[in-house]
Amino acid sequence: MKILKSLVLLVLFIVMPAKAHDAFSWMSTSFSGLKGLFGCLEVPEFTSFQESNIGINLSKAGAWQSTGHTVEKGKLLKINWSIAGVTTEPRKYLVLYRIDPRFSTPQVFIKTYNYSKLQFEALGFPRFVTNSNSSIPGAIPPDKDLDALSFTKMSDSIKYFNYSKNNVKIEVKAGDVVNISLVGKDNFFTSNTLDNILTEELDSSIFAPSALYTQSNLGNFDNRIIYASAKEVCDIIDAARDPDKPSGCSGTGAATKYKSINSNEALVGKPMMIGAIHNFMGLINSCPEHSGINTRPACYYDQGRGMIIKVGGQVIKERDQSFVKSGRNSFIYYQATRDGIMNFTSDWQVSNMFNNSVLMSDWIRRFLNYPSFIDYINQNDWSANFLYFGRYSMIVEIGNGANSISADVQQNISLEYLITYDGTLPDPSIRGTPVDYNFAADAPKDGYLWLRVVNPNSNIQGVVSVNYANYTGTTWFSDIVYNGAIKPITDQFRTFSKNFYIKLIKNSAVQNIVKAALTLYVIIFGLMFVAGALKLTAIEVITRICKIAIVAFLIREESWNFFNTYFFSVFTDGINFFITNVVGATSSRSNIFGFIDPIFDKYTNGRIWGLLFIELLQIHNGLAFIAIITIYSLITYFRAILEVIIGYVIAFIGITVMISLAPFFIILMLFEKTKSLFDNWISTLLSYVVQPTILLIFFLLIDQVLSEQLLKVVVRACWDTLIPIKIGLDLTNLGIPINFSFTLPFLPGIPFYVPDVPEISRSNIFTNNANTFLVLFTTSLLFYSYCLMSYGLVTFVNIVVGMLTNVTPARISGNYQARSDPVGAVMQDIGSVTTPMKNASMVPARVFKDKIIDQNYKARKSEGGVEFTNKFFSERNDITKKEEGARE
């Protein structure tokens, strides 16, 4: 107390130094300044685990992401992750739809967007093989003739447009949402294309009828289709058929023909020079809605008209249907109802455009060499009966947020973790440790935790959700209990069981017993079969053969390895397997008793016991009684934890002992009269596995309730006056009318932490608000009840396991009703050993209760007096009644 007062005064002097003119103002100083200094002690939250989550966007796949957490070597690290937020990226395609009379169907150039490379790519496009000096893949070497080269590539061109090469088809799944938009030609010929394929128009100043082209010479009048007779075209560009005007028109009426000027470019879908086509497009208008071919006067089709789009054979856009126009955008929005390939086609035919065959597929069959092909092109008249040309540039986007990603794609996504000694961002080339969806292991070293997603798929998007937690509490208790005590015992009994088993099967007497039992079994079986007393079925024969094989294998040298691998390990490892999987929160995966560490972290928390000690000092309002109940309940609960540990050890020892005796019981399964002993042996092994598992399940359920109740029993405490000091003088009993009391401003009482509990009043005595006396009292009783439940779990679980496995515990000698409880017997022995220490620790408590609380003193008997006890300050205890009467 002197030290406490000195400390308080020292703090006051430091906070408020005295000055000469202060006089006695220090007497008016209170302890309110200390309140802000010491503050309040809050009820702690049980945070043995550091938990958090992170969302890793697939756009950052391959890069390490910081969690901001540090982990400790040998302590639990849990990582759970989900790909529920991952969806397929919208599949993007650039499509160039072009009319070319050399192909029976429209040309369709397709470029696919590769998300991993962030580029478009024209897969399977029949490009030229270039020399090593060319900087542009697919470029034509300057010393080669375009037409001669392309003649040998005609078959590749046909295969490309028939999807028989490696070019990608646009696949659509049922439920996919398809969006097709018209775009400018620059969008298709984007420079962001792999290997620079189709980044520019396919064109040449030299006419090559066997080469591929992309232009239609529409210039600024792109995304349009022309289908008109030669007469309608010529009536616009040269109605008079002026021979001095080189228009390419000849003939009149139905005999009108049109031929490209200075070349035969109409063969490749370029019927006019750029200037001429611009002039022609300026003279015609857009065709009316739902107009067919050969509309008079000539007109052009736009907004996708003239093109049919199908998915799996189902038409999603009719030929005469226009794209929806919104501002500058023209698009079609469609949700697929079936699986299939998207196809761009038209029912307008190109056949009969010329009098001679212009199909590239016919040229391949007819001409075996280039000179004969050139002669055919140069010697024929390529005047067109009608003109059908033009193109559309489109971007196709296909997505489906409702459909989940495929199983193959899911398997390709992986998560890795990495632990580094410092917080420096690791290099992406550093490999991490892969984890499954529910990963739990001990951290291999101390350091900072990093996570990353490895995603080899280029067509998915979204966020991978990762929840991670690591244990941050102490592990001293489980290290002592498991590594220091239990593991040596279990390892020793494992070795004992193995050695005893091996010695047993090598014993000549045991081997003779096995051989005799097998011989007797076969003889009895044969006699019963001969006598007709045995009705054999296929199952009966297989069962008897298996029994003979198992017992015969028992006396072989590899008997232990066989039975331990395929049978005994089910029980020896099964008990650890069940306990490990039942436990949720644990400090270490390698320590099966790691679940005790979080429990001890909760119930040995220094703040909890500090607040309980503060409540112990509240004798005047009954909080001390609540604290005593809580402390006693915790001690009872700790004893229950000890029972769980002892129950596990006894169960494991029982399993190893039963396994060591396995040869005797396995022999007994041969005969029906002894088979019940074998069955009981199996039931006993099973009961030893089930008992600690069920016990732990009940124990953990009670622990969850206890954690909540404990936080309600312990209350917040703030720095305040613990014991008020009041000086008073009352002389009224002497006839002097003086009666006053006062407190010292500088020392109103003994300061300390005081529980933040409202005083009892009529308004709150029966309320159930938090921290009222009624709530604290009822909660402490509930806490005590739950602790008593945990204390009686062993007996209850023994009864439950006995009902399940039909294995009844032995009875106590002389008491048929009482069952033997090995755990209870061990606890009773521990109690006997600790009784002297318990009694010694209770002596100060009894003295405190007797002398201070009850104020009950016993004095030595005076000479001639009688020893008696009475209340302190009420009567003297060291004199007799006779002496007291004499004084009066």
UniProtKB/Swiss-Prot annotation:
Main location: membrane
BP terms from Gene Ontology: protein secretion by the type IV secretion system
Family: Belongs to the TrbL/VirB6 family.
Alphabetical UniProt keywords: Cell membrane, Membrane, Signal, Transmembrane, Transmembrane helix
Signal sequence annotation: 1-20
Keyword RNA-binding: no
Protein name: Uncharacterized protein RP107
Gene Ontology cellular-component annotations: plasma membrane
Localization (cell): Cell membrane
InterPro entries noted in UniProt: Conjugal_tfr_TrbL/VirB6 (IPR007688)
Pfam family, one: TrbL
Membrane association type: Multi-pass membrane protein
TM annotation in the entry: 513-533, 565-585, 611-631, 649-669, 682-702, 781-801
